[in-house]
A protein has these predicted regions:
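Short acidic, S/G/P-rich loop/turn micro-motifs used as interaction or catalytic elements
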Residues: 32-33, 80-82, 103-108, 145-149, ...
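Conserved beta-strand/loop subsegment of P-loop NTPase cores
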Residues: 96-99, 128-146, 176-186
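Substrate-engagement module of ASCE P-loop NTPases
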Residues: 120-131, 167-175
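Glycine-rich phosphate-binding P-loop
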Residues: 22-45
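Inter-motif core of Ras-like GTPase G domains
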Residues: 84-110, 122-130
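Switch I (effector-binding) loop of TRAFAC-class P-loop GTPase G-domains
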Residues: 42-72, 81-83
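Canonical P-loop GTPase G-domain recognition
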Residues: 147-206
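Short, flexible boundary segments at extreme N-termini or domain junctions of P-loop NTPases and their
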Residues: 1-25, 173, 188, 204
Length: 206
């Protein structure tokens, strides 16, 4: 019975986009690369040089090789605290959330990140006053690792990076988060065509 309850709980949160995914939401901390990721998914060459405040993302075809899938219209919002209330508008049934975190600012943004993660999962589970959301998924995408490596004068294996993020945010102590949070952390260079293709393929081949 306990195993079934755990399975039902984790069913709220897919590890990657699934056939039930209808929308993509890219959220996160200021400067983590949200607009850069949207540009990469849309094959736009614009480089994010200023802070995004709020702009509409029109429906578009996400393409990778010969494969493609329609991505529903949504919004690209800023990463400041002012924009957190917009999460309620962007996360609906069937939404997969990519939450972007700049590995170089984890310590200074720790409290803000933890608060936002708690809000997202409470929304999905219906513990923030709403009805809850069905068929949603979630992943933390760790960005700017190249700068992190340069600052630390060495590279880290992926597993060590994930541990650094998980421990730095103390994910295990955030009430309401799935127990498998370590499996939901991925690293990515948003300026790398290969890494963008990996994300595209993950969304397309769901």
């Amino acid at each position: 019975m306990i195993d079934l309850l755990i399975y039902a709980l984790l069913g709220y949160f897919f590890l990657k986009p699934s056939k039930k995914t209808k929308k993509i939401a890219i959220l996160g901390i200021k400067g983590a690369g949200k607009t850069t990721l949207w540009n990469g998914l849309r094959d736009e060459s614009d480089v994010e040089t200023v802070t995004t405040h709020y702009q509409k993302i029109e429906e578009f075809s996400l393409k990778s090789g010969k494969d493609e899938v329609k991505i529903a219209s949504t919004k690209d919002i800023g990463g400041g605290d002012y924009y957190v209330p917009y999460y309620d508008e962007l996360i609906e049934d069937g939404t997969f959330v990519y939450f972007l975190v700049d590995i170089n600012t984890i310590k200074e943004n720790k409290d803000a990140i933890r608060m936002r993660l708690r809000k997202i999962f409470n929304m999905i589970k219906g513990e923030s006053g709403g009805a809850g959301k069905k068929d949603c998924g979630f992943k933390i995408l760790v960005t700017h690792t190249d700068v992190f490596f340069n600052n630390n004068l060495k590279r880290m294996p992926k597993a060590q990076l994930i541990e650094y993020v998980s421990d730095g945010l103390e994910l295990a102590t955030i009430k309401g988060l799935p127990r498998d949070m370590a499996k939901r952390i991925e690293t990515g260079n948003l300026n790398s065509p290969n890494d963008i293709k990996t994300i595209k393929d993950e969304i397309i081949h769901r």
